[in-house]
UniProtKB/Swiss-Prot annotation:
Chain segments annotated as transmembrane: 17-37, 47-67, 71-91, 109-129, 138-158, 167-187, 206-226
Gene for this chain: spyD
Protein name stated in the entry: Terpene cyclase spyD
Major enzyme class: lyase
Cell location: Membrane
Keywords assigned by UniProt, alphabetized: Lyase, Membrane, Transmembrane, Transmembrane helix
Role of this protein: Terpene cyclase; part of the gene cluster that mediates the biosynthesis of meroterpenoids called sartorypyrones. Within the pathway, spyD catalyzes the cyclization of epoxygeranylgeranyl-triacetate lactone. SpyD exhibits promiscuous activity, resulting in the formation of bicyclic sartorypyrone F and monocyclic sartorypyrone D. The biosynthesis of sartorypyrones begins with the production of triacetic acid lactone (TAL) by the NR-PKS spyA using one molecule of acetyl-CoA and two molecules of malonyl-CoA.
Organism listed in the record: Aspergillus fumigatus (strain ATCC MYA-4609 / CBS 101355 / FGSC A1100 / Af293)
């Protein structure tokens, strides 16, 4: 029995729930990426921080092209994510170069820096897979990439001090997509512990707990900033 076939009876009983969670995560993230593309070209600003974007694309590349997981639904969604993410990378670099940055070196070489950063993250996932195994890299690494994006998006919101380049739709789809996937992982850990019990560990619980905290904090700050911006518009009118 491996980690992707010959399901035990305990997991077979909840497998339909798991499939719904995977489909929910896939659809929510796909919608999130499409909305992100629209936001980038509408507001002419990066919607996703470059660090988390590179980490996320590297994970998708690793899953789709390097360590293909034998689960068709998951592979289809990952392939679609990767394609849309290429547009996000293009848009993010394009709008970033339209604005003058404090570091002219970074500003000038951004089209080179981003691909190198993605390759660096891919090599990190590859090294991790050689160290701890493919399933742990794909699923544990995916949770970590999601956590990095949550923290990075909150930092970007605080650094900008405005809702420019963000939206409630982006936040909601990211939250629903992330936690549908994480709940699915914990479901496997509980009902298929022989292969997936490793996921229910202190690090994964910490990542999940911290991500929930950051996402709630993000929503509160985003709402506050939105209210302040509306009030400012009212005063100008």
């Amino acid at each position: 029995m491996d980690a992707y076939s010959s399901f035990p009876a305990e997991f077979e009983a909840v497998r339909p729930i798991y499939n719904v969670l995977v489909a929910t995560a896939g659809m929510m993230w796909l919608i999130n990426y499409i909305v992100t593309v629209r936001q980038i070209f509408r507001d002419r600003v990066r919607a996703i921080p470059l660090v988390s974007l590179c980490c996320n694309i590297a994970w998708e590349f690793t899953v789709v092209l390097v360590y293909r997981r034998p689960y068709l639904l998951f592979e289809i969604f990952c392939a679609m994510w990767l394609l849309v993410n290429m547009v996000i990378v293009y848009g993010s670099v394009k709008v970033s170069m339209e604005k003058q940055r404090s570091s002219s070196l970074v500003h000038k070489h951004l089209p080179l820096i981003v691909p190198l950063a993605i390759l660096g993250c891919i090599s990190g996932y590859y090294a991790l897979a050689k160290t701890i195994g493919t399933p742990k890299t794909i699923h544990g690494g995916g949770t970590f990439a999601s956590f990095v994006m949550t923290v990075d998006c909150l930092c970007q919101l605080l650094q900008r001090g405005s809702t420019h380049g963000a939206s409630w739709t982006m936040w909601l789809t990211r939250v629903l997509g992330s936690y549908a996937a994480i709940v699915g992982e914990f479901l496997k850990a509980g009902f298929w512990p022989q292969q997936w019990g490793w996921y229910d560990n202190a690090l994964m619980r910490w990542c999940t707990g911290m991500a929930v905290t950051m996402d709630i904090l993000y929503a509160c700050i985003f709402w506050y900033m939105g209210q302040a911006e509306e009030a400012a518009k009212g005063r100008k009118a």
